[in-house]
From Swiss-Prot:
Recorded GO MF terms: rRNA binding; structural constituent of ribosome
Lineage: Bacteria, Bacillati, Bacillota, Clostridia, Thermoanaerobacterales
Name this protein carries in UniProt: Small ribosomal subunit protein uS17
A Pfam family that the UniProt record links to this protein: Ribosomal_S17
Matches recorded under PROSITE patterns: RIBOSOMAL_S17
Keywords from the UniProt entry: Ribonucleoprotein, Ribosomal protein, RNA-binding, rRNA-binding
Length: 98
């Protein structure tokens, strides 16, 4: 009897898009300390495949687990949930207009 695999899906923020067809996604999770019960914020980075180079730094994306695509890449970008604000874009417009 075959077991159906549950696909892992995570939501995170793109922290780097310097590589070709690859982005680094930081996924943040809240965990409770086992002894003190304080909620701790933990961040883990995943390298994800971005086929069309559509993601930019600051975007919030949904990634899904897939077969190994390279030495460290085991995730792929499913969708871009929200576009991140590009820093410095407004400043450039002001200097051109003014």
């Amino acid at each position: 009897m075959e077991k159906k695999k549950v696909q892992k899906i995570k939501i995170g923020r793109v922290v780097s898009d310097k590589m070709d067809k690859t982005v680094v996604v930081a996924v943040e999770e809240l965990v409770s300390h086992p002894l003190y019960k304080k909620t701790i914020r933990r961040t883990k980075k995943f390298k994800a495949h971005d086929e069309h180079n559509a993601c930019r730094t600051g975007d919030i994306v949904k990634i899904a687990e897939t077969r190994p695509l390279s030495k460290e890449k085991r995730w792929r970008v499913v969708e871009i949930i929200e576009r991140g604000k590009v820093l410095g874009e407004e400043e450039n417009l002001e200097t051109i207009e003014g």
